């Protein structure tokens, strides 16, 4: 029978370990050291699936660790994580998740109901505009100014501006 203090310590250690699984480089480290080939370690990963229960999952700061924990149940994924390029690919996907999906989700959660459709339409328009701009950029020719003109522009930019206009 565990004491309350040892239960708390075990909870904290397991929580930290599960969250460490969100780091693809750490998974690569474990795979290269042969941990994923050890039966006791694979059984430990199965045991840790209890973190998917909402009462435990709410304690996690990095919810993507649960996805990694689920993926680690697959022998194929564990084998793939031993290779650097595979770990790099997973890391890139995690970064893309942070950059785009979570930002979009946050925006959608902040909108009142009924505006979701407007956001989707405006995003489609944005994609179309970006495609048009990229097509237009292909036709642009960059002409460099002579060094004398560049120096003059740099001097003009360095001159102090009239701040009295800013106070109005």
Swiss-Prot record:
Compositional bias (Acidic residues): 113-159
GO terms classed as biological process: regulation of transcription by RNA polymerase II
Domain of life: Eukaryota
Subcellular location: Nucleus
Keywords recorded for this protein, A-Z: Activator, Nucleus, Transcription, Transcription regulation
GO (cellular component) term, any one: mediator complex
Major site of localization recorded for this protein: nucleus
Short name of one Pfam family: Med31
Location of the region described as Disordered in the Swiss-Prot/TrEMBL record: 113-168
GO molecular function list: transcription coregulator activity
UniProt record similarity statement: Belongs to the Mediator complex subunit 31 family.
Annotated function: Component of the Mediator complex, a coactivator involved in the regulated transcription of nearly all RNA polymerase II-dependent genes. Mediator functions as a bridge to convey information from gene-specific regulatory proteins to the basal RNA polymerase II transcription machinery. Mediator is recruited to promoters by direct interactions with regulatory proteins and serves as a scaffold for the assembly of a functional preinitiation complex with RNA polymerase II and the general transcription factors.
Assembly: Component of the Mediator complex.
UniProt name for this protein: Mediator of RNA polymerase II transcription subunit 31
Organism: Caenorhabditis briggsae
Protein encoded by which gene: mdt-31
């Amino acid at each position: 029978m565990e004491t309350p203090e040892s239960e708390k310590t075990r909870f904290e250690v397991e929580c930290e370990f599960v969250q460490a699984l969100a780091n693809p480089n750490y998974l690569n480290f474990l795979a290269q050291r042969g941990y994923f080939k050890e039966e006791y370690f694979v059984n430990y990963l199965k045991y840790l699936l209890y973190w998917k229960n909402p009462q435990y999952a709410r304690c996690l700061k990095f919810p993507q660790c649960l996805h990694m924990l689920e993926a680690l149940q697959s022998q194929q994924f564990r084998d793939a994580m031993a290779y650097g390029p595979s770990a790099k690919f997973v890391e890139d996907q995690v970064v893309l998740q942070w950059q785009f999906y979570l930002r979009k989700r946050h925006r959608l959660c902040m909108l009142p109901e009924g505006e979701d459709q407007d956001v989707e339409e405006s995003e489609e328009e944005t994609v179309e505009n970006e495609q048009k701009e990229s097509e237009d950029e292909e036709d642009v020719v960059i002409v460099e100014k002579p060094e004398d003109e560049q120096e003059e522009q740099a001097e003009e930019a360095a001159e102090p501006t009239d701040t009295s206009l800013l106070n109005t």
